[in-house]
Amino acid sequence: MDKLGKFCETIEAAFPFLIKFNPMERLNSLESTEQPSFQIFYGIDAQVKQNLRRVLAAFQQWKVGTHHFSSVSGYGHDDLGRDTLDRVFATVMQAEAAAVRVQFVSGTHAIACALFGALRPGDELLAVAGAPYDTLEEVIGLRGQGQGSLMDFGISYRQLPLTSVGQPDWDAIATAIRPSTRVTLIQRSCGYSWRPSLTIDDIATIIRLVKQQNPDTICFVDNCYGEFVEEREPPAVGADLIAGSLIKNPGGTIATTGGYVAGRADLVEAATCRLTAPGIGSSGGSSLEQNRLMFQGLFLAPQMVGEAMKGNYLIAKTFSDLGYPVSPSVTGPRDVIQAVELGSPEKLIAFCKAIQRFSPVEAYLEPVPAAMPGYESQLVMAGGTFIDGSTSELSADGPLRQPYIVYCQGGTHWTHVALAIEAAVEAIQQL
């Protein structure tokens, strides 16, 4: 049996409901359903290979050895493993410098340190791709009071809305920079919004338009969910600073906590001065025996991202065939987030319950809507993951607000996603 035939049998075994809901016979639907999947998966694997080549070259360049897996205690001064990981990570991210730290408790924390490090009273922060992710609203000062937000420190905020089709407003960006605009915030991922995630080419265009107006304006990219989904990272196209989380893409599903900043050396150091203290910056902070997991997670990351992208393609294809709006589209560029507009709270909750039942950890629990720190709306979340809160492993969640969109993230292997989505479709069909 040829490779395509074997792949088709795998798809049919993992997705029997596709046959149930599709009146066409398997052989008749081969060209329209299974062969495109094979071609798309092959393309993802080719991209994984290129990204892994870049990671491997960085490990070789900086001569990573087993002695880098140990760490020091206390202040964390002269942590050879940590400092070498910083150099490897900077090379992988195509940046001048990087700081990878377990002391970053989340991507939001890393982003906050980056923004507070770069901005001063009287400066303006300009979001150029619509509203930011919910958890950044309190960092900026759009919600909450007296917590030490950017606005509390005299930093102003402005945002440019997206176009009606969810794209950056290029004309508005081309004239948006003011003398006080110190930092532009470019959120790469869709977050909890119905828009395509930004491609590297999109980010390059934004940076070009900003720098044409003021070369000194800092272009900061929230890189969460975007690492390794293309063959270039934002610093390669001119981003001054990026930040993200290790329990997302770059941790390879095994980093237990942490985040990173990468970009210009002075901006990275400024961000670490917000993480630790002025005068300490990147020289402090023990890695707490986590170096080996962070090195290994980075090495695994391209493959894990590829598996998540395959799983998200299957989610998009399945629910699009069933008539649900999906973003990104089946054939559109994607990262590790797949949104499906389910249209009712009952379907959103049923979907998340099914994902939880098909999780390896705490499958016996049932997700219920609840408030979560940093979010305005109640959330329902399915996340039976080995690392608490990991979105590199398969998870699904959504705010309990219209139009009741579920956001699926991650997946250590696409076959697990296939099993979980089969259960989710069955749960929705039974309502």
List each language-model region with its residue ranges:
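N-terminal entrance/gating region of PLP-dependent enzymes' catalytic architecture
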Residues: 8-11, 15-84, 399-408
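Structural motif
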Residues: 96-100, 123-126, 182-183, 216-219, ...
